[in-house]
Every structure is written in C-alpha cells, then in structure tokens.
Amino acid sequence: MRHAREVTFARLMRTFAAVSDTQTVASKHKTAPKAADIANRLRKEKEKEKDDKNEVPVSPLQSRVNELKQFSQQLQSVHPSVFAKALYRSSLYEDQNIIAINKPYDVPLHNINGIRNSIAECLPLLAKITDNMRPGSQLHLCHKLEKETTGVLILAKTEEAAEHVQTLIQSHKVEMKYLAITVGVPVPSEGVIDIPVIERAVVGPQPHFKMALSPLFKVNEDGDGVTRVRAHRQAHAAVTRYQVLDNTSGCSLVELQPLTGVKNQLRVHMALALTCPILGDHKYSHWSKLAPQKLPEGTLRRLGLVQSKTRYLPLHLHSRRIVLPGFKGHRDITVSCPLPKYFINALKRLEIPLPAKE
C-alpha cells in the first residue's frame, strides 16, 4: 500500500509540475490550462505504466535466436576465405577420401538470390585449406542438406569418392538420422511413413510452390476401407522412419530417418502426414499462405516468446548422425554432430530431456 501511495504521489507531483509549467506559459499568453489536457496526460502515463508491466522479458531462447540471426548475417558478410576457414574449424571427421563438416544454420548449399556465401562457392577455398593450399585441390558435395537444416554434411576429396558415397546413398546403404522438435506429439509414437511427395502450386494472394503428399490410397466414399489409386507420374516415393524420444508440454523430440531423399521430405511428412510440424517450420505450418508459424499459448509461454516474434524461430531440424559403409574395404565410418545451442535451449525451455550422446 505504501508503495502504491508513493507511486500515486509521484505521479501527482509530475502532473502538478507539468500543470505549473503549463500555467506559467499560459499566463504569458493569458490562457488557463485545460482540464482535458491534464486528463489526457494522466491517461497516457497510466497506459505507459500498464505497458511496462505487461512487457515480456527477453528469454534466453529469444536472446539466442537474436544471436543466431546476427551470426547468419555475419556469415554472409564475411570474405569467402574467412567463411571457408570457419567451416574447416567446424569439421567433424576427415580422412584421405572425405571430410565431414558441421553445416551452420541458414547457409545454402548453392548460391541463391541475396546470398553471398554458400557451401558450393567456398569449396575451392576449403579444398586448399584441407590440402595444405596445394593448387588443383577439389572437394565435392555428396548429398543435400537444406538451407535451414544444421548438422553433418559429407564432402568428398575426389570425384571417385563422391560417386561412391552418392551410389551408397541412392542404394539406401547410408544411415542418416536427424533430430527434430515438433509442435504436437506424433501418434503412434513410432512408425514408418510411406507416402509419395509431389510439388504443387498454391494459388491465392501469395502464389507459390510447395511439396505435398500424393497418397497411394483414398478412403472409400462410404467410409468403409480404402482403395489403392494410381501413382501420380510426377510424384516421388518418400519413406521416413520416425520415433518419439520424449515429449512434454505438447511438443516432442523426434528421431527421423529418411529412407529416401526427396526435397523437404521430413518437413512434409511431419507437418502433413502426422500433423506435427517441426518447430520453426514457417513454410509447412500453413498450406495456403506464407506466414510465421502459429504456436499454442502454452508453447509460447514455455519458450518465453510472443507470437509476433515466432517469425525469427529457426527450423529445429538437425542432421545428427551419418553412418557410411567402409570405403575400399575399410571399416564403417560414423560421424556425429552436437546439437546447436538454440536447439538445446529450446529443449531446456520445453523441459524435454537432452538426448543421450552418441
């Protein structure tokens, strides 16, 4: 009560001082202060105090998201040689045939509009660094990793090694495991999603293209059973194995293992097949529009975010481990990659236990 009286008294004193000043000026112009002006001033001060009380403090996650945004901008502003050195310092594994790096968030494999640094563009510089600056050194991309996805990326030192790795991937002999935080809990908690994916045009105020499901079965009109339909000629077979590792507060930590390599496959299967979009997936959380992901109030509260700030949430999809069969008679190669800090912070905020280290 005493604090409230002091605040009220201080407010009255400020108002009185303001009124006194107004009266001084008014006396020079022979006009009196208007009651409406005083009431308006009091109203504005009251609204300001209310806004101050309702202001949401910046959470550790939001701070990390801001840092991540700045880091992404810095990666695109540095000289390519500096960028290449940063990638080399992030290397996870290296031998005479391949090098595995930890791909940063928001870095594309190939040049796109408005992006200065990409993995492909810096390969010549990175090759020289890995080969003690010898002229003619080369590195080759072995597989795809989306711009917003972090984690293990395999590069080959020769064309022969690149072709070998690509052949292994195409023949489904390479084990790739991802970790994702999903909005929602997949049911059942584990299984295999075998639904082809096709690119579709989205019409409306924001026309664009997205990958979509192209099921091989449809529900009968009477609701009794399903009927197999002919596969669309432009659809791609897409198979994903998934397992929920833990869940709480309406969110889940899910391990994903793609058995095929279709564009946006994991994101499409989670969002459209299981209706559990990946946290930070602003593309597939809505179908008919391009807009920031809308999160439940409980999730926002745990993450320490407001809905207007979700547009800055990164995609929480991480390439955690790749296992390559032995090259030329050597033993299998297992490359693991630690989670990025923003991913760990999100798990902590959601009170989801961190996965065991591999």
Curated annotation (Swiss-Prot):
One of its GO terms (biological process) is mRNA processing. Its main location: mitochondrion. The keyword Flavoprotein does not apply. InterPro entries: PsdUridine_synth_cat_dom_sf, PsdUridine_synth_RsuA/RluA, RluA_PseudoU_synthase. GO terms for molecular function: RNA binding; tRNA pseudouridine synthase activity. Keywords: Cytoplasm, Isomerase, Mitochondrion, mRNA processing, mRNA splicing, Nucleus, rRNA processing, Transit peptide, tRNA processing. It catalyses: uridine in 5S rRNA = pseudouridine in 5S rRNA; a uridine in tRNA = a pseudouridine in tRNA; a uridine in mRNA = a pseudouridine in mRNA. It is found in: Mitochondrion matrix; Nucleus; Cytoplasm. One of its GO terms (cellular component) is mitochondrial matrix. PANTHER family: MITOCHONDRIAL RNA PSEUDOURIDINE SYNTHASE (PTHR21600), PSEUDOURIDYLATE SYNTHASE RPUSD4, MITOCHONDRIAL (PTHR21600:SF83). Catalyzes uridine to pseudouridine isomerization (pseudouridylation) of different mitochondrial RNA substrates. Acts on position 1397 in 16S mitochondrial ribosomal RNA (16S mt-rRNA). This modification is required for the assembly of 16S mt-rRNA into a functional mitochondrial ribosome. Acts on position 39 in mitochondrial tRNA(Phe). Also catalyzes pseudouridylation of mRNAs in nucleus: acts as a regulator of pre-mRNA splicing by mediating pseudouridylation of pre-mRNAs at locations associated with alternatively spliced regions. Belongs to the pseudouridine synthase RluA family. This is Pseudouridylate synthase RPUSD4, mitochondrial. It comes from Danio rerio (Zebrafish). The gene is rpusd4.
